[in-house]
Amino acid sequence: MDAPVTLITGTRIGIGRHLAEHYLRLGHRVVGCSRNPVDWTRDGYKHYGADVADEKAVKAMFSEIRRSYGRLDHLINNAGIASMNHSLLTPTSTVNAILATNVVGTFLLSREAAKLMKRKKYGRIVNFSSVAVPLKLAGEAAYVASKSAVVALTHVLAREFAEYGITVNCVGPGPLATNLIRSVPKQKIDRLLEQQAIPRMGTFDDVANTVDFFLRPESGFVTGQTIYLGGV
């Protein structure tokens, strides 16, 4: 059986890079993308420079995937941005950028992936939300709105793609050691952790374990679901 082809967005650093290396170790053929160049490479890994909110770039990337592999088994919509500001201090340009990457990007990648996946009547799509949604975190209005939209999008795409053997699920990580939260005051992180049933920082492996579950062929009866990590 051919090794599965897995596309992961936002693979330059952080969770995305960890997931890319994780699935390479598991024998996947991994395709990654990011707006900026990566400073790493691995056997079996192919990287594209693409903004997930740029429809032309996304379509070009999928044309290359189709030519190179003829298939796509998994899509992990990891790419995301945040801006932690009070709403009164957040410019519209920031809101538009967050929505473009987190919502439009997730939609575009999912749409194009489903076109390729439906040929084989099989596919797994995993989106990324955040515990910021159920916790309704103040100071992150645009980010929370975008990640709420991802949850809603997951529900609808799960229904639309089910007839093609494609499942669509979502993982909502809590605080992780990424660039997104390094500028957040420790007191705010501590208050957030206190609201979790398991009051600790998450790890990249915690995220990978959840994504593993959603990607398994045996998870074919699970779709439209969001798992928030840490117990919120």
Regions inferred by a protein language model and the residue ranges of each:
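Residue(s) in the substrate-gating loop at a strand-loop-helix junction
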Residues: 130
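Active-site loop immediately N-terminal to the catalytic Tyr-X3-Lys motif
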Residues: 88, 135-141, 163-164, 199, ...
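Substrate-binding pocket helix/loop in short-chain dehydrogenase/reductase
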Residues: 86-87, 91-99, 181, 192
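Active-site helix of classical SDR
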Residues: 110, 146, 154
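C-terminal substrate-recognition "lid" of short-chain dehydrogenase/reductases
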Residues: 107-110, 122, 200-229
